[in-house]
C-alpha cells in the first residue's frame, strides 16, 4: 500500500515521523505517541495509545517503525479517497443539490444508467436507505447504505 505514495508524500511523512520519534531512535513508542497526541490537544489513555500502536505494529515489537508508519498513513489516505468518492456519488444523485436524494432523483439517475425500475422498486430502495423515515435519503443515510455492503 505504501508503494502508491509519491516521493514528496514519503518525505512529508518522514518529517511527521521525526516529530513523533522524540529520541530519534527510529521507532515511535506509546510514550512518544502520547506526547504528540497531547500536544495536539488529545488526551488518550495508555490503553488507547497501545491500541493505536498495535493497529499498525505489524512485527509485534510494541513500537512503530517508519515502514509501519507509512503503511498507516497510506491506509488513512485510502480511506479519505473512498469518502470523497462517496461524496461525489451523492452529488450525482442529488440533482437539485438540496442535500437529499428524492425518489424522482433516484429514478432519473437509475434510468440514465440503463436501469428500468418500477416506482415500487425505487420506493423500496429509498425505504431501505431512509433510516429517519422522511421519505428521502440524506448524506449520512447514503454513506450508511454505501458502506454497509
Curated annotation (Swiss-Prot):
Q: Which GO terms describe its cellular component?
A: myosin II complex
List N6,N6,N6-trimethyllysine occurrences by residue. 116
* Disulfide bond annotation, renumbered to this chain: none
Which Gene Ontology MF annotations are present?
calcium ion binding
Identify the keywords attached in UniProt to this record, alphabetized.
Acetylation, Calcium, Metal-binding, Methylation, Repeat
Against Gene3D superfamilies, the record matches this protein to: EF-hand
UniProt domain EF-hand: residue ranges? 8-43, 44-79, 81-116, 117-149
Binding residues for Ca(2+) 2, per the UniProt record? 57, 59, 61, 63, 68
SMART domains listed in its UniProt record: EFh
Query: What positions does the entry give for Ca(2+) 4 binding?
Result: 130, 132, 134, 136, 141
> For the modification N-acetylalanine, which residues carry it?
2
UniProt family annotation: Belongs to the calmodulin family.
Instruction: Quote the function comment for this protein.
Output: Calmodulin mediates the control of a large number of enzymes, ion channels and other proteins by Ca(2+). Among the enzymes to be stimulated by the calmodulin-Ca(2+) complex are a number of protein kinases and phosphatases.
Q: What extra comment accompanies this record?
A: This protein has four functional calcium-binding sites.
Q: In its UniProt entry, what is this protein called? A: Calmodulin
Traced from the root, the source organism's taxonomic lineage reads:
Eukaryota, Metazoa, Porifera, Demospongiae, Heteroscleromorpha
Amino acid at each position: 500500500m505504501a508503494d502508491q505514495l509519491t516521493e514528496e508524500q514519503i518525505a512529508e511523512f518522514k518529517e511527521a515521523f521525526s516529530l513523533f520519534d522524540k529520541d530519534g531512535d527510529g521507532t515511535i513508542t506509546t510514550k512518544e505517541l502520547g506526547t504528540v497526541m497531547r500536544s495536539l490537544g488529545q488526551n488518550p489513555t495508555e490503553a488507547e495509545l497501545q491500541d493505536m500502536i498495535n493497529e499498525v505494529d505489524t512485527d509485534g515489537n510494541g513500537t512503530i517503525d517508519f515502514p509501519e508508519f507509512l503503511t498507516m498513513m497510506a491506509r488513512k489516505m485510502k480511506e479519505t479517497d473512498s469518502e470523497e468518492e462517496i461524496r461525489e456519488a451523492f452529488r450525482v444523485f442529488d440533482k437539485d443539490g438540496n442535500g437529499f436524494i428524492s425518489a424522482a432523483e433516484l429514478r432519473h439517475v437509475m434510468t440514465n444508467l440503463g436501469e428500468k425500475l418500477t416506482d415500487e422498486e425505487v420506493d423500496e430502495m429509498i425505504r431501505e436507505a431512509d433510516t429517519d423515515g422522511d421519505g428521502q435519503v440524506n448524506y449520512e443515510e447514503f454513506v450508511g447504505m454505501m458502506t454497509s455492503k
